[in-house]
Design a protein with these regions (language model features):
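Membrane-proximal intracellular helices of multi-pass ion channels
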Residues: 1-533
């Protein structure tokens, strides 16, 4: 039985709506490639600049043509918006890979060698992107703020691409569709709501969705700017000999990747590249700001009351988790590194507090909880207990709902926990007792409470299901030398530059770029920084 003409017409109409909106998004993405183009020109990286110019032009041209051809399509309904969100990320990542591929092929060997720090014995990581799959991986990882990277040696890609990697994470953190709603067009009310919700957002800061999108981006830009200023000043005070130019460049890039909780870095060994305990401490606030819900920032600004941060239950729970988690992870690491106990509990606590175990436990647990993923330790060298502690004690839950973090989110975990305690307490209540559920500053009737608990539980179950499936996939493809802990660590949905694979695999792929398999070079990008130089 052949499909009806009306069915074909509906499919064509729906396709035109999707193509138009994805095309508009690509016009924006192409225009944003002008920013790393300017950075490349500033640092006289001419071939990188040319790659961004070509890529931006192609992306904007294709997007513009698609938009013009389908400009008369109807406004998107919810099912259109879901398709736009799904395909929009895929198409954007594909076009976002173009600069990597083009630069890898057009940049002369002598120029690539100039990107490699003096005295280093490795090649520029731009060569990795001669494989289009590697370039797509890098782009997708950036836009989704996953943070896994094929830039094995980050400084060797040049300033233009260091900026580009940070920029795509920053854009992906707040959401490309939210950005397009704020800048490109103002669809009708229901259409705007559909597009906005298609990225999984529910917070509404202003009466209109476009107003909400703009408010989100104003807050996002403002907080990022403040974090950049803070990092620049703090770095200058801690490392006055680091250089003003590099201080500012690192500060802006780390502000973008910190606020997006994506975890890309300008340094080869992430934050450990500074080799400074003080710089570890400096970067902790930059991670925490990204894990706080944007509506809380909006409330604090609109009410001009910083106490809004303390009133938010997610913030309170998050800092409570920091305290408990840092103590727990430090205890695991103290046993691993062998801090001796001599019978004096006070003295032992003092030695632990000044040990490498506390330094790593403090930074890495907060990095895991906020899902930023910056590293100051070679996590692949940790014992399995410490690795499992940060996976199940921090990464799975993540930071606040309404922030850029990954994980189940504190709010959902809080609702599920309160729901369990509520259900248990109801067993002991009299038959006609009022059993409303209070969560934060809101009180829910029984039906509302059940809906909230069901929604949070469903999302948590779906998240854990994806984790389990990913775990089995990794167990099937990982080489035999990797443990179950490695697989669990890598399979949990990422939001940061977390990796636990061994240096030997990194060396193998780096030394044989032209002969190693795509899959093994792919795993090379998922490594933690080498444990020894």
């Amino acid at each position: 039985m052949s499909p009806s003409p009306s069915g074909r017409l509906n499919f064509v109409t729906a396709s035109k709506t999707v193509i138009r909106d994805i095309g508009a998004l690509q016009v924006l993405i192409g225009g944003l490639m002008l920013i790393p183009l300017l950075v490349s020109l500033l640092y006289q990286e001419w071939y990188s600049g040319l790659a961004f110019l070509i890529s931006g032009g192609v992306t904007a041209l294709v997007g513009g043509v698609a938009y013009k051809l389908c400009i008369d399509a109807p406004e998107p309904k919810r099912y259109h918006a879901m398709i736009v969100a799904a395909l929009g990320w895929l198409v954007t990542a594909a076009f976002g890979a173009l600069p990597f591929i083009i630069a890898a092929y057009i940049t002369p060997t002598a120029v690539l060698e100039s990107f490699v720090p003096a005295g280093a014995s490795y090649q520029s990581s731009l060569l990795n992107f001669q494989n289009p799959i590697h370039a797509l991986f890098e782009s997708m990882s950036g836009y989704t703020t996953t943070g896994l990277t094929m830039s094995v040696r980050e400084p060797s890609v040049g300033h233009g691409f260091l900026w580009y990697r940070s920029q795509i994470q920053w854009i992906g953190g707040a959401g490309m569709i939210v950005l397009s709603l704020a800048i490109l067009r103002q669809p009708l009310g229901a259409a705007g709501v559909s597009l906005y919700q298609s990225e999984g957002r529910s917070e509404k800061l202003r009466p209109s969705i476009v107003g909400t999108a703009r408010a989100i981006w104003k807050i996002y830009v403002g907080v990022t700017a403040l974090v950049a200023i803070y990092l620049a000043i703090a770095t200058f005070l801690v490392l006055p000999g680091y250089g003003i130019e590099q201080t500012i460049f690192d500060a802006v890039n780390h502000a973008m990747t910190g606020q997006s909780t994506g975890g890309f870095s300008t340094l080869d060994n992430s934050i450990a590249g500074y080799n400074s305990y003080a710089m570890d401490i400096v970067h902790i606030p930059a991670m925490i700001t990204g894990a706080i819900s944007i509506p809380v920032y909006y409330a604090a600004v609109s009410e001009r009351d910083l106490r809004e941060f303390a009133r938010d239950p997610q913030v309170r729970v998050m800092f409570g988790l920091f305290i408990v988690g840092v103590i727990g992870l430090t205890a695991f690491l103290a046993r691993w590194v062998g801090v001796p106990y001599n019978g004096d509990p006070i003295g032992y606590v003092g030695r632990v507090a000044t040990s490498q175990a506390f330094r790593e436990g403090l930074f890495q647990f907060i990095s895991a909880q906020t899902t930023t993923g910056w590293q100051t330790s070679a996590i692949g060298d940790w014992n399995n207990g410490a690795v499992m502690f940060i996976v199940f004690g921090a990464m799975l839950l993540g930071g606040s709902a309404g922030a850029t973090v990954g994980g189940i989110k504190i709010l959902r975990g809080y609702i599920v926990a309160r729901g369990i305690s509520w259900e248990v307490s109801r067993v002991f209540l009299p038959e006609h007792a009022v059993d409303d559920l209070r969560i934060g500053r809101r009180t829910f009737k029984t039906d509302e409470a059940n809906d909230e608990i069901r929604a949070a539980g469903t999302m948590a179950a779906a998240y854990l299901s994806v984790l389990v499936v990913s775990l089995f996939v990794l167990l099937a493809v990982l080489p035999s030398e990797f443990t179950l802990a490695d697989a669990i660590f890598e399979s949990r949905p990422h939001k940061g530059l977390w990796a636990s694979l061994r240096e030997s695999l990194a060396r193998e792929c780096q030394s044989s770029l032209n002969s190693c398999s795509s899959s093994r070079c792919g795993w090379d990008g998922l490594r933690s920084f080498p444990s020894s130089s």
